Amino acid sequence: MEKLTDLNYTLSVITLMNSTLHTILEDPGMAYFPYIVSVLTVLFTLHKASIPTMKIALKTSKCSYKVVKYCIVTIFNTLLKLAGYKEQITTKDEIEKQMDRVVKEMRRQLEMIDKLTTREIEQVELLKRIHDKLMIRTVDEIDMTKEINQKNVRTLEEWENGRNPYEPKEVTAAM
């Protein structure tokens, strides 16, 4: 019986909408007709969808207050979007969730900054050690024997008989 009365109610609402639309269409100067039709359609859909949804939610849910609050907030947010507002209604639960998310993100960024700072300090210490090793030390006389690998090189006076052993000798070949 409830379904039958619900059907009669729906038919009467549709009839009311049709009669309203016909009276609007008779006015030739009506420029906002598509907007009015879309708003009426959305309102009717919200009306028809919200009541059964609320009934089902209240029957199946243990926390009925939260569900009702969420449904009402969703309906108002939809109406605000239709009206062109960018602001939305939020519940305390949503605000707390967003705050927890923000705090979690801030902690993550602080940990990352701490890691990066530690790495930078380690890099600075490494660069300081490299600089200390590469530091130029002034010496009075530079020993080049290590650089050219000639520790046992003799001077002309030190050679036997004063003769250079690496000079080419005259070689005669038999023909």
From Swiss-Prot:
- Provide the residues annotated with a glycan attachment (glycosylation): 8, 18
- Family matches, as Pfam families: Rota_NSP4
KW Cell cycle (keyword) present = no
Protein's GO biological process:
monoatomic ion transmembrane transport; symbiont-mediated activation of host autophagy; viral process
PTM (free text): Mannosylated.
Transmembrane intervals: 29-51
Alphabetized, the UniProt keywords read:
Activation of host autophagy by virus, Calcium, Enterotoxin, Glycoprotein, Host endoplasmic reticulum, Host membrane, Host-virus interaction, Ion channel, Ion transport, Membrane, Metal-binding, Secreted, Signal-anchor, Toxin, Transmembrane, Transmembrane helix, Transport, Viral ion channel, Virulence
Q: Which domain of life is it from?
A: Viruses
| Annotated GO CC locations | extracellular region; host caveola; host cell rough endoplasmic reticulum membrane; membrane
List of residues binding Ca(2+): 120, 123
Membrane topology field: Single-pass type III membrane protein
Question: Topological domains (Cytoplasmic): residue ranges?
Answer: 52-175
Q: Where in the cell is it found?
A: Host rough endoplasmic reticulum membrane; Host membrane, Host caveola; Secreted
Membrane topology (Lumenal): 1-28
State a single Gene Ontology molecular function. Answer: channel activity
Function as written in the Swiss-Prot or TrEMBL entry: Plays an essential role in the virus replication cycle by acting as a viroporin. Creates a pore in the host endoplasmic reticulum and as a consequence releases Ca(2+) in the cytoplasm of infected cell. In turn, high levels of cytoplasmic calcium trigger membrane trafficking and transport of viral ER-associated proteins to viroplasms, sites of viral genome replication and immature particle assembly.
> Which HAMAP family does the record cross-reference, listed alphabetically?
ROTA_NSP4 (MF_04091)
Q: What is known of its domains?
A: A disordered 28 aa C-terminal domain is presented to the cytoplasm by each subunit of the tetrameric receptor. Binds 1 calcium ion per tetramer.
The Swiss-Prot or TrEMBL record describes its family as follows:
Belongs to the rotavirus NSP4 family.
Q: How does it assemble?
A: Homotetramer. Interacts with the immature particle in the viroplasm. Interacts with host CAV1, early and late in infection. Interacts with host integrin ITGA1/ITGB1 heterodimer. Interacts with host integrin ITGA2/ITGB1 heterodimer. Interaction with microtubules blocks trafficking to the Golgi apparatus.
Name by which UniProt lists this protein: Non-structural glycoprotein 4
